Amino acid sequence: MNVKFKMPKLSNLLKKSWASELLMTFLGTTISIVLTFGTATWVEHRQQMKNRRQTAMMVISNINVFGENMRYIDSTLVKWSSTLRYIAELPRDSVLNLSTDDANAFLSAMFGAMLLQRDKTAENIFTSDISTWRDVGNLRFISGVGECYSFINDIEKNYRIQLERKGELRQRFFEDYYNEQMTGGECVAALLDMKGTKYFINDFTGSFVYYFEESINNLLQMNRINMQLIGVTPEEVMNFIKAGEQPLQ
């Protein structure tokens, strides 16, 4: 039996070979582009997520540090409040006969000032570059941070008012009695007799110290909600703060 083989034309072989190579080249290029683009997108997404978390941690830590600074100041305010109230309620004869230590404690409470300071870098970033915060992608978190900073500004304003009132009383007292030779008890009595002193003491001991303490609790509670919104624990915040306090090597 004769078997006939039909030889393909050379032109057909060339066409098939060219088409095959072209197809393989196209597929290879497509796969390469897809893999490269997909990897780049994934890396970018991971970096964005990392940046968002770092930015959020910076703000949360900043608010927390302010709250803890308030707590430190509050311990002194409570002592001052107790001293002022106790001595202001004493009979005048007892005031005139105060010991040097008690008189000094009263004058320190009246004229002492602890500055409530903070680093405003995080707040400035928050308020000046809102696009940065849109990238965080959590509107409730953004709103919560804004409320915290608004609350902090109110606290600073009210605290500054107390310092200014103290400063006014201090200036008037020294203008009136700078050249007077008085005992500690006489100084305290003169200060209590001065217009505005007892009103300040009543306001400071009766409402401001309470307001300050409640503000600490409220601010830190608001910030705990911020932590929950982005899945951050208090331990992570403390570690972030400690890392920021380390000196550069």
Where are these regions (language model features)?
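Membrane-embedded hydrophobic alpha-helical segments
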Residues: 9-47
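Alpha-helical transmembrane signal-anchor/signal-peptide segments
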Residues: 43-61
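Interfacial alpha-helical end/capping and short helix-turn segments at domain and membrane boundaries
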Residues: 2-14, 60-249
